[in-house]
Amino acid sequence: MASKESKPSRTTWRDMEPPLRETWNQVLQELVKRQQQEEEEQQGLVSGLQASKADQIYTGNSGDRSTGGIGGKTKKKRGWYKWLRKLRAREKNIPSQFYPDMESNMVGMENLTLETQLEDNALYNPATHIGDMAMDGREWMEWRESAQKEKRKGGLSGQRTNAYPGK
C-alpha cells in the first residue's frame, strides 16, 4: 500500500509553484499583451459606433484579410471583396436618422401627389383613348410604307444598294 503514502498527482504544494520572479514576468507579459490589444482595437474601431472587434470597420489596409502566396485569391476577387467590405463599412456608419421609423408619420410623404399637369395629361387617363385605339389597318400600312419609302430614297449614301434588289 505504498500508493496511499505517496501524494496524488493532482494536489499542489508550495514547492511546485514557480519562484516569485517568474510569475511577475508572466504578469508583465500579460499586461503588455493586453495593452497592445486595446490599442489595436482603438485604432481599428471608430469610437462610439462599434463596440466589438467583430464590427470592425475596414481601415484601408490593402493586405487585410487576403491570403498571400500559392492558393491565394486572385487580384480581381480580392479587389471585389475589398470593395464589398468598404461598402458594408459605409453602411454601418449611416446614422439612425437615415433609417426612419416606418410606423411614425414621415413628414412630407402625405403631401406627395401627382402634379395637376400630369393628372390632366391624356396619357395618364386610359379611358380617353379606348375608342381611338382601333385604327384602320390600311391607314397604318399606308403611313408605314410611305415612311419607309422616304427612308429608302435617302438611303445610306449608296452603301446598301443591293439590300432591296426588287425595288
From Swiss-Prot:
Record's compositionally biased regions (Polar residues): 158-167
Subunit structure: Homomultimer; when bound to the RRE. Multimeric assembly is essential for activity.
Residue ranges that the Swiss-Prot or TrEMBL entry lists as coiled coil: 21-45
Protein keywords: Coiled coil, Host cytoplasm, Host nucleus, mRNA transport, RNA-binding, Transport
Protein name stated in the entry: Protein Rev
Locus of motif Nuclear localization signal and RNA-binding (RRE): 75-92
Record localization: Host nucleus, Host nucleolus; Host cytoplasm
Intervals of motif Nuclear export signal: 106-115
Organism encoding this protein: Maedi visna virus (strain 1514) (MVV)
One BP annotation, GO: mRNA transport
Molecular function (Gene Ontology), one example: RNA binding
